[in-house]
C-alpha cells in the first residue's frame, strides 16, 4: 500500500500540465480584490469597468465610489473579516457596494432583491453579519428586524477628501459568503 497514491495527481507527467497547468509561483501574490481594483484604476482609469443598460462607469469612477462606500463603512465600524449583507436590485450600485465592502476587508453576503425578509434575517444572523446594505426602497422592510442598515444612496453621498483606509486585510479573509436554500428548508452558508 505504501506505493499506491490515489489521492494526488501525477504532477510530473507531461499530461498534468494540460490538465492542471504549469506551476507558476510568480502569479501567487498576497493581493486581495480591492488591491486588484485599485491597480486597474491606476493602470487604466478611463477604461470602462461596468456597463448596465446605457450606463457606463470607468475604473476611476468605480474606485472613487468604492472608496466613498468603504470610508463610510469603516467609520461605522466595519472591519476586515466581518460580513456585510448586500440586499439590492441588480445594477451598477450593487457592484459598487461589492467593491466598497471589499475595500473594507469585509466579505459581502449577496441576497437577491426578492429574498423574503425572514430568510434574509436568518442568513444574516447565521453568518454573524454586522449589518446590511440595501436601497431606500427596501429599507422600510427592515425597520423591525434590529439589523444595522446602511443604504446605498447614503453611502454614495458621503464625501471624504482623504478616504479612510482599511488595515489588517489578509488574503485569508473571506471575500463573499453565499447561502443556499438547503434541503431542510433552512438556508445554509
Predicted regions and their residues:
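Carrier-protein-dependent adenylate-forming modules in NRPS/ANL systems
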Residues: 1-189
